[in-house]
């Protein structure tokens, strides 16, 4: 059998909890919050790329 390491002891609880469902909503609101923050971040990047948001010290030159 394999050798036990500190890393395997640290990761074992994550593996033993795999497949178990937390009652109720669990961490769904937290996931929704992070998805919303990611959406806002990507939206800001897109607006900078399309020059919808004009930043004085920042310019985007694509192509020639």
Swiss-Prot record:
Transmembrane segments: 29-49
One Pfam family of this chain: PsbH
Superkingdom: Bacteria
GO cellular component, one term: photosystem II
GO MF, one example: phosphate ion binding
Family: Belongs to the PsbH family.
Name of the protein this chain belongs to: Photosystem II reaction center protein H
Annotated organism of origin: Prochlorothrix hollandica
